[in-house]
Amino acid sequence: MFCIQCEQTIRTPAGNGCSYAQGMCGKLAATSDLQDLLIYMLQGVSVYATKARELGVINPEVDTFVPKAFFSTLTNVNFDDERIIAYAKQAAEYRESLKNAYEAACEAAGKRAESLPPVAQFVLGTSKPEMLSQAPVALLNKDKNEIHEDILGLRLLCLYGLKGAAAYMEHARVLGKTDAEIAGRFHEIMAFLGEPSVDADKLFTTAMDIGQLNYRIMAMLDAGETEAFGHPEPTVVNTKPVKGKAILVSGHDMKDLELILEQTAGKGINVYTHGEMLPALAYPAFKKYAHLVGNYGSAWQNQQKEFANFPGAVVMTSNCIIDPNVGQYSDRIFTRSIVGWPGVTHVIGDDFSVVIDKALSLDGFQYDEIPHNITIGFARNALMAAAPTVVENVKNGSIKHFFLVGGCDGDKSERSYFTDLAKSAPKDSVILTLGCGKYKFNKLEFGDINGIPRLLDIGQCNDAYSAIQLAIALSQIFECDINELPLNLVLSWFEQKAIVVLLTLLSLGVKNIRTGPTPPAFLTANLAKILEEKFGLRNTTTVEADLKTMLNVA
């Protein structure tokens, strides 16, 4: 086992990364090894998908399968070995199908089929023990003693960034949005990563390419969400329980939320969002459901306590899931799509009857708690509509600064930095937030500036696209570069979606971003120095020191 993809990973003087029997996230060594093997199989599929594409052969099923299966290896998504094995076997079948199609296309074109790299020729074992014995060939640091540590760091930056992009591709696909050109570029990068490069310049360029690709993917996902559910609008949301039977929907998948709302209508069940599903409450399409009563709980790392106290059924539509046995609610939590946990019921298809029956069998909340409201829904359309008013307040001096503070949340005590930063931001500044990092301060009161709320909740982590659009619009209005705006980005990272959002921002030329609370363990000191020199990327320090720098206070 070697896994170094999230903030929780082990860091020691002898080296970084989870190994031995179990990772810090709870992932067993066998699961980690099987996930590495799955990635290796998917890279082989992408090799053939790329070669076949050159001859006009495109398999749409493969184009959607590879990102989806890749997503299953993201932090806190799938801990079920049998599900990972099934994905690997399916990858082998798709690769064989593409191989045959490629060779047939070569023959039809009168050309000789190329000899492809080992990753495209690997023969997957037929049993779990055999697959585990094959794991060393797919180990991400298998050649660490032969290469410079910076090369390994760059490879992992690319791999984890592409994994985040794959997650957004799958979110878009669920909403009916795919793009053959995006899929083709995705396969090219997967294939490239399947042949471990030692070219630092090529790897760095690839990292920026992944960022550019993800910008297009986020635009596609934004279109999927807004076309399906309308544009988010400023909305007041209750964060306290309401009396009645209950279902909690966590993750990111709004299509699943819609299905659950449709199937629970008239059944006396209240539905709550959790974590990154909170932004759904701002979409017009969901406001017709009176039994969508609010948001329960906070960010993913608190779920073992929050889910244990939730007297209903819980549905995990995507990341993040952690051990449900700790809070003894494994019999009433359900997984969907790429999510998996051993022994937890997995809902296949669009019938949520098993979830509904479980919710009806449970007590639900016995009384209404005193409401606590927050305001959400300041996504792209709402931000653009407010832009003229914002500009006027900037010009008259009422608004002097903007902070984008968001990203992933986590359980490190150092993350209090983000709470303290938001609370310490000057009263003439506006704070934009997104992702589950918002839970560090989104229930606090920040007031307004001439009617403009000082805290603007943009949405999910992928709604960084909305923030980018606002920054572009403001830079055009003020006729300046994005980096000349009175705007500072402070991003909290935990896993691979945050990595690809960061790569997207860097690829667009956004500079002087701060990330924290700790830098990714796979980034060497030398790589961190290069990123600081090239982009001004730096780690957070203290709120007082960082604010002085950001506000240009001597």
Curated annotation (Swiss-Prot):
Textual note on the cofactor: Binds 1 [2Fe-2S] cluster.
Cysteine persulfide modification, residue list: C408
Localization annotation: Cytoplasm
EC numbers: 1.7.99.1
Reaction it catalyzes: A + NH4(+) + H2O = hydroxylamine + AH2 + H(+)
Main location: cytoplasm
InterPro entries assigned: HCP/CODH (IPR004137), Hydroxylam_reduct (IPR010048), Prismane-like_a/b-sand (IPR016099), Prismane-like_sf (IPR011254), Prismane_a-bundle (IPR016100)
One GO BP annotation of this record: response to hydrogen peroxide
UniProt GO molecular function: 2 iron, 2 sulfur cluster binding; hydroxylamine reductase activity; metal ion binding; peroxidase activity
Annotated Pfam families: Prismane
Record: residues binding hybrid [4Fe-2O-2S] cluster: H252, E276, C320, C408, C436, C461, E495, K497
Keyword field: 2Fe-2S, Cytoplasm, Iron, Iron-sulfur, Metal-binding, Oxidoreductase
Listed cofactors: [2Fe-2S] cluster; hybrid [4Fe-2O-2S] cluster
Disulfide bonds: none
GO cellular component, one term: cytoplasm
Enzyme class (EC, first level): oxidoreductase
Binding site residues for [2Fe-2S] cluster: C3, C6, C18, C25
Classification via HAMAP family: Hydroxylam_reduct
Stated role: Catalyzes the reduction of hydroxylamine to form NH(3) and H(2)O.
Family classification: Belongs to the HCP family.
NCBIfam families associated with the record: hybrid_clust, PRK05290.1
Protein name: Hydroxylamine reductase
Taxonomic source organism: Shewanella sp. (strain ANA-3)
Organism ancestry: Bacteria, Pseudomonadati, Pseudomonadota, Gammaproteobacteria, Alteromonadales
